[in-house]
Design a protein with these regions (language model features):
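P-loop NTP-binding/switch modules centered on Walker-like glycine-rich loops
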Residues: 1, 5-95
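Short catalytic/signature loops enriched in Gly
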Residues: 66-151
Length: 151
């Protein structure tokens, strides 16, 4: 195969086995020129194995780009909140956690406008009515958020 879908492939495994599986996936990727769609909630694994990242909220992409760009400079408020929950390797290091509040919409009956607006601390009136279009922020980094609408 040229394309493999990996849906939470290491989520229930112990850390040592996870590392072995991830290393095997990378080795196979290099030797066989494979492309993976790697679906995971473990952001440290995503950062380690991915070249490109897509962050999804309620079934839709809110931000895409090169892994190093997304992790260094998350733009969408959901991506920022998600990344603020990643544990720091240094126990003395501090990170401001962004706690999401508000109602979690039903995927079967999503709200009008931006699907994240019910939980977004930066919600504007337009967010409640109009779904944002993807904005290219340069070098393939795209974000769906009215905060980045062109003036």
């Amino acid at each position: 195969p040229k394309f493999i879908v990996c849906d939470e492939p290491v989520s229930a495994l112990d850390v040592c086995i996870q590392a072995q599986i991830i290393n095997l996936l990378r080795e196979l990727q290099e030797k066989r020129n494979l492309t993976y769609l790697f679906i995971s909630h473990d952001l440290s694994v995503v950062e380690h194995i991915s070249d490109t990242v897509g962050v999804m909220y309620l079934g839709g992409l809110v931000e895409t780009g090169k892994t190093e760009d997304i992790f260094a400079n998350p733009l969408h408020p959901y991506t920022k909140a998600l990344f603020s929950a990643i544990p720091m390797p240094d126990p003395d290091a501090k990170r401001d956690r962004i706690l999401l509040e508000g109602d979690i919409p039903s995927p079967a009956n999503p709200p009008a406008g931006c699907k994240f607006h019910t939980r977004c601390k930066e919600c504007m009136e337009i967010c409640k009515h109009e779904d944002p279009k993807p904005r290219d922020m340069g070098d393939g980094h795209k974000v769906k958020c009215h905060l980045y609408d062109e003036v």
